């Protein structure tokens, strides 16, 4: 079962820059899928970096406020424990790969946490089968499509059985078909009771799986929408908020060239 996340008056600024996160308060329920959306540079990715612990340990800056995961303040969770608690999927999976072939990448986390050889084999096979990539275990990561690489990234996170998944624009390099398939993976993780936080521009593939959507502007949460509210949001308001339309067909229509007129 996933863990709840409680964020209180969170503010963060990168060294030498203004606030990237501004007084954010947010409660994420255990087993919930939430989407952080908004214009580029609004602070979505920075908020995910606080939740997964990359801020302030890998990204320096000024951090204030509180964040709790389950019953523990995040700062009291050791880095090794945090790595097992939170699985990460990034925009470009190559940025998180440590091995050259699929099996080695999925096994990497298990090896770091001292799993036995038999446990590693079992976890790798289960994660690969779950993501339907068992036929790729001996393949080089460099030969795979972006869609397959994202499946490997999910499998490598899933192998250590985290309770929380944090994803930063995971569909950015995927085509429409691969994006919908990625949505199926999220749906399956939700069915397992995992807590999932997704920073994303594309919304259409999440409309039937996300529980809530949070619009972020200038580092602050300015609007919260239920799934039903997001689906029924007027196009004019979507545009005003700087969001992409959650309706794929409407998006395709908007991108069509205008008919020539005399």
Can you say where each PLM-predicted feature lies in the sequence?
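Catalytic Walker B motif of ABC-type/P-loop ATPase nucleotide-binding domains
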Residues: 165-168
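Conserved ABC ATPase "signature" region
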Residues: 118-136
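ABC ATPase NBD Q-loop/coupling interface
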Residues: 66-81
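A short, flexible loop at the N-terminus of ABC-type nucleotide-binding domains that lies
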Residues: 1-7, 12-23, 55-60, 78
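Conserved ABC ATPase signature
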Residues: 140-144, 148
